[in-house]
């Protein structure tokens, strides 16, 4: 195993010869690696620009997945380094996101189910508020499109002409508007390009802005379960906007 390439909340990425291995934290179960490798392989089979998945390995009592190595910096890094090119990158991201949504995803888990489970489990909202959210979510469209789950510039690598999307554990089936709203939320919390990204996606797809923003209270409530430092206050404000 070679040098450490990246560190995430759930895993570390190391060089593995000419490839890389995503090595999960020691507490991660064997089925986590196999499940996520299967998800990635299913996305790869659709012809989307993702790294090839090669195998599941156990290394030093930790489970991991071996992928092709992707060269180049993330779009987030490139955007920070060239503010003038941000509109171009957002257009590329929007087109790529729409390309993902072009695929049906009947074999994937349900986006609304994932959101509902997270909303029901958060203790940061009282029971009446959770029930209001769950009732509203039930009336939102189901959809049958492939959704990335947390599509944002950190997980898109490489050249603007050949972007590669990495890290697919949250891939699911649902309404593209709900998926885009999740991206909008992440960008709103951590960058100042959320509105511009939303405009770019709406321009590419002709989906009304309001259709996407209708998902915002549900996306924000579900995000509370992830316990990301510094997000709680703003998420609660968005939830209470319902």
Where are the language model's segments positioned?
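An alpha-helical support segment within catalytic cores of ATP-dependent transferases
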Residues: 102-149, 159
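Helix-rich C-terminal or lid/interface subdomains of diverse kinases
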Residues: 72, 175, 182-242
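Active-site acidic catalytic loop and adjacent metal/ATP-binding pocket
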Residues: 12-15, 134-178
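Internal "kinase-insert"/substrate-recognition segments embedded within catalytic cores
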Residues: 83-113
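The N-lobe alphaC helix and its flanking beta3-alphaC-beta4 segment of protein kinase-like domains
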Residues: 31-46
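ATP-binding glycine-rich loop module of kinase domains
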Residues: 4-34
